[in-house]
């Protein structure tokens, strides 16, 4: 097994945001094509993959306009990897015609992925075994310094039609404790859905990083 490079050693690499990878779902993701790109880098004696930010995106689809420095972009979730876990079927993730074009289609990609991610969440909530539930709870505990606030923010952003937080109800935008607690309770399932997305992202990210490091390729953000 090769060792990943260190910043103290001179090495070359390639800059490529994962959404620029080819794929059938409108944008690249952390699935098969990302692994293939890692293999290509290793075979080409490249030691670094500079990925730019992989945080959630907002209006304009810029990775530099993220609502969180800790969360991952759910758009980068690989449906193929989720299907391998049994939460989706191959038939369900079959992409519609037109998504696999030469240019990224962020809105169309999310419009296709989001309902499937919600379906995966519903199945996980109903059918996950004890080991999977413990893994989810362990992730939530390990990310307790940022995940609860991020998941609540993401849930409220969607429930407010994507409006800026400054246009939300006064209690929420001023972070009134009672208002936040009430929102967290009223929208518990939606908050948990966003926690679940980050759980999936963490798993897929770690798997890709392990593969890359095993081939002597390091991952750099920006």
Tell what function each PLM region has.
Residues 2-221:
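Acidic/aromatic-lined carbohydrate-recognition and catalytic surfaces
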């Amino acid at each position: 097994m090769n060792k990943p490079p260190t910043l103290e050693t001179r090495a070359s690499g390639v800059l490529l945001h994962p959404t620029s990878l080819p794929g059938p779902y409108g944008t690249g993701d952390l699935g098969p094509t990302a692994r293939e790109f890692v293999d290509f880098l290793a075979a080409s004696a490249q030691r670094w993959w500079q990925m730019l930010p992989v945080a959630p995106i907002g209006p304009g689809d810029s990775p530099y306009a993220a609502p969180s420095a800790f969360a991952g972009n759910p758009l980068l979730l690989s449906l193929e990897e989720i299907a391998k876990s049994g939460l989706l079927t191959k038939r369900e993730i079959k992409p519609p015609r037109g998504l696999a074009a030469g240019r990224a289609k962020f809105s169309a990609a999310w419009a296709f992925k989001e309902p499937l991610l919600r379906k995966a969440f519903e199945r996980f909530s109903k059918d996950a075994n004890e080991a999977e539930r413990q893994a989810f709870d362990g992730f939530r505990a390990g990310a307790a310094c940022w995940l609860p606030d991020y998941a609540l923010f993401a849930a409220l952003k969607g429930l407010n039609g994507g409006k800026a937080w400054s246009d939300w109800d006064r209690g929420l935008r001023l972070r009134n404790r009672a208002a936040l607690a009430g929102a967290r309770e009223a929208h518990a399932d939606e908050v948990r859905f966003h926690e679940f997305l980050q759980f999936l992202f963490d798993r897929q990210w770690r798997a890709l990083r392990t593969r890359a490091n095993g081939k002597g390729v390091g991952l750099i953000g920006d």
